Amino acid sequence: MKEKAARIYLTATPDEKWKRNFRTGKQKGIIVSGRYHRHPLPVPLFSWCGNWKKSLHHKKIPRVLLQWLKMYVNKKYPIFLFVPHVRYIEEIGLLLKGLDHRIDGVHAEDPMRKEKVEAFRKGDIPLLVTTTILERGVIVKNLQVAVLGAEEEIFSESALVQIAGRAGRSFEEPYGEVVYFHYGKTESMVRAKRHIQSMNKSAKEQGLID
């Protein structure tokens, strides 16, 4: 191994220390604010859904979320529904079977994880209920993204930015809606939205967006 060599870090969500060091010049770096297809990042919308845990306790999906999901299922657009904990996956998946019996859920320890993700890519599964394990590495045309319980602590600014980044990645269909369904807006939600808006603004100024 060489005694002197460059080490390059690549991240979509640098932490506050990295941002501070970059601003003050302690750490060198560049910001790539545009996507290869030259379209802006989808900016998340906030939608208050009430006490969603209470709704689930009564075996119901919050109405505003259900209406949103139904709209895109009917349009035959693929959907990721992110939930804050694995314990909600099966419960919500079963409650949503009325929309389409093929709706399924997946988590990190799921032995059928790869098969389900591939079926989702092919369109055989219209909606996947999942956790933050599917933040990265999945590109699906026309993908719509929802987060239930976006106010939960696990959904940090970086996690919410990564989740929003699942939408609009396809070259053929570089658009998609991202909605944070919540029972109280958090600072992480606000920062995530601001982060994405800032990236779009920077990309526009650099001529990286058509």
Regions picked out by a protein language model, each given a short descriptive name:
Residues 3-10, 77-78, 124-127:
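Loop/turn-to-beta-strand initiation segments
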Residues 15-17, 157, 164-197:
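Conserved segment of the helicase C-terminal RecA-like domain
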Residues 28-89, 93, 100-103, 207:
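Conserved interdomain linker/interface between the two RecA-like ATPase lobes of SF2 helicase motors
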Residues 66, 110-114, 127, 131, ...:
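Amphipathic alpha-helical transducer elements in NTP-driven molecular machines
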Residues 84-87, 103-117, 129-137:
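Conserved helicase motor
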Residues 127-129, 135-151, 161, 177-180:
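A short beta-strand element within the Helicase C-terminal
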